[in-house]
């Protein structure tokens, strides 16, 4: 596996940095959502990229790639996913729950909860059915025409789809996610792709964006090194027979993190 960081010029939309910068454009974000959902959206508020929801001091917070509201108070969370993790459906559930808690304050009626979409754009087929789009909504098992009506929708888009289940615009857009080039955009029939490419080129040509990208890469490297050092300390104590709870206390680390590192170590 090649761990060498990409140059900003080599980024595709599947890369978080470029995806967030492109989706921070109100009009592009609105049109992407319209195309994915096949609905009309009059207006969206300024999209928030890398929105953090950390509601509980001792809980696990989340960072959302793109978080946006439209003129009807519908909430959209769009995530770019390149790693095929078996916990992806439960991650979608966890994101949904945190968004709900963030939307409604204590004492407010449940009616204040808004319609929400949690959308994962995946560079793999999680469900292995060949579809480009998988949409999930709570329905009655005994009567699948009966919808629960909690207004929560989870969608998983697949750039590797093979079925003829969506229109050509969606197919082209999903291909473009992994092949974000001027050549692809020029040959595309989807007008949205051509407009996204203009934004992509503006981001890649910006010295300010390049500095920001390089700064994030450096921070990621430092965090990985810090994580590696912490992992070595945990394993060293564990091999000495120190209890997990004691390791957590001694190193001032979350017990959940300590247990995960030990599980990973034992599975090698």
Please give the residue ranges for each predicted region.
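Accessory alpha/beta interaction modules
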Residues: 1-153, 163, 222
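Upstream accessory/linker segments immediately N-terminal to the RecA-like ATPase cores of bacterial MutS
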Residues: 142, 149-180, 187
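Short, charged alpha-helical interaction segments and adjacent helix-coil junctions
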Residues: 2-9, 17, 67, 71, ...
